[in-house]
From Swiss-Prot:
Comp. bias (Low complexity): 110-120
Subcellular location: Cytoplasm; Endosome
Protein name per its UniProtKB record: VPS4-associated protein 1
Pfam families named in the record: Vfa1
Provenance organism: Saccharomyces cerevisiae (strain ATCC 204508 / S288c) (Baker's yeast)
Organism ancestry: Eukaryota, Fungi, Dikarya, Ascomycota, Saccharomycotina
InterPro entries xrefs: Vfa1
Alphabetized GO MF terms: ATPase activator activity
BP terms from Gene Ontology: protein transport; vacuolar transport
Alphabetically ordered keywords of this record: Coiled coil, Cytoplasm, Endosome, Protein transport, Transport
Length: 203
């Protein structure tokens, strides 16, 4: 039996106790390779690795990888913006201005020149950061939607092994019952009479 279950919904009239909390549930995990099924509440399928682990699609995994890349880019841009506006950034900027003033003493307005050099870059970085945040939000929405739509799960190792043991026990009991029925049907009626003969009344 393959450890792959699909979450399905059944009608209210078919609901059965949850395998975890015993409350009535309409959600059933079905394994076609068994076949095997067990009822569970929706809440137990969310962030519960001791019970089930979601089996996400390739599209979901690609979206998560893309989300991590965009998050890293966004963090680096945010860090650069923070450093530019921090005390250390301003101190560095002041010292660089003083160096330019001493080196270019003939320049009538060095501050204006410096501001025109740095301001477009800062503006460009802010625009890139804004676009990156929009991209991150869009990918995050996609990941959340794919996570919500996921219906495939695998049981935790201990849980799956207990299901396998239960299936084997049921199979052994079924085979034993069939064998007993076959032996009973193949028995000679006269032999049955001899085995189950009642004691006669003493003479």
């Amino acid at each position: 039996m393959i450890n792959e279950y699909v979450a399905r919904k059944v009608a209210l009239k078919d609901m059965q106790p949850c395998a975890i909390c015993s409350k009535p549930s309409t959600t059933v995990l079905y394994n076609a390779s068994g076949p095997d099924w067990l009822y569970t509440c929706e809440i137990h399928l969310q962030d519960n690795p001791q019970f089930v682990i979601p089996l996400y699609s390739t599209e979901y995994n690609e979206a998560v990888a893309q989300l991590k890349l965009v998050k890293g880019k966004m963090d680096s841009l945010t860090s650069a913006q923070t450093q530019l506006g921090s005390w250390d950034g301003w101190v560095t900027k002041i010292f660089s201005k003083k160096e330019k003033e001493t080196n270019n003493s003939k320049d009538p307005d060095p501050t204006t020149t410096d501001s025109t050099d740095t301001s477009p870059q800062a503006k460009n970085d802010a625009e890139i950061l804004s676009e990156t945040k929009k991209q991150y939000s869009k990918i995050l929405d996609k990941v959340t939607e794919l996570q919500r739509k996921n219906r495939k799960y695998e049981l935790a190792k201990i849980m799956f092994e207990s299901r396998l043991l239960r299936k084997r026990t049921e199979q052994v009991n079924r085979e034993r019952y069939l064998k007993e029925q076959e032996n009973y049907s193949n028995t000679d009626p006269e032999e049955l009479l001899r085995k189950h003969v009642f004691p006669s009344v003493p003479k």
